[in-house]
Amino acid sequence: LIKRPEQLAACFAGGADYLFQPDKQFAEFDSGDRTFQCARRIDVLKLWVAWKAHGDAGFAARIDHAMAIADYTRQRIAASDGAFVSIVSGSFTNVVFAWVPPELRPLAALHPADLDDQVRTQLHHLPPQIKARMQAEGTGMIGFQPVHGMNTFRMICMSTTLQTTDIDALLDAIDQYGNEI
């Protein structure tokens, strides 16, 4: 479409490692960092259109649903007997967590910066492998990004169709694939 495709990255790339992981499957096909839509420039238009379409009450209901699903996800992680650990605490629609192999449970530290290098390295390599397996088998799609040098899962709970059963299935798949690695 353009004479010099490299100019797209030069103009729009923010280099956000939390969005565009080089170690994910099919990274070479991810055009996100080469598009106008990736930058924050367009977000205000998307927000305005969504608000106009749903109105105040509809927009509030969407946010309440997203928060409820995120809270449910955090509750499932907390009740997982150490299979999952929350990496970033807080009350918002993003849930950042790690899967922990049985031999490392319970973790001596919950923050990546406090883990010993060997454990952090072991945990770092798991999310890309688990995500690739989920993609290959079509069981789910979840992002991951580094937090203090360790890849972690990042669940963004914004879809109005997302239900607690979807969260259960996703966490069960992560646990299953992690145990099979």
List PLM regions with ranges:
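Generic recognition of stable, solvent-exposed alpha-helical segments in well-folded globular domains
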Residues: 42, 61-68, 72, 90, ...
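Active-site C-terminal subdomain of aminotransferase-like
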Residues: 1-80
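A generic structural motif
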Residues: 53-57, 103, 159-163
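Conserved PLP-binding catalytic core of the aspartate aminotransferase-like
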Residues: 86-134
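Generic non-transmembrane alpha-helical segments
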Residues: 72, 76-80, 126-138, 173-181
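PLP-dependent enzyme catalytic core of the Aspartate aminotransferase-like
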Residues: 107, 115-116, 147-181
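Short beta-strand
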Residues: 85-90, 142-147
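Short, hydrophobic beta-strand segments
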Residues: 49-50, 96-99, 153-158
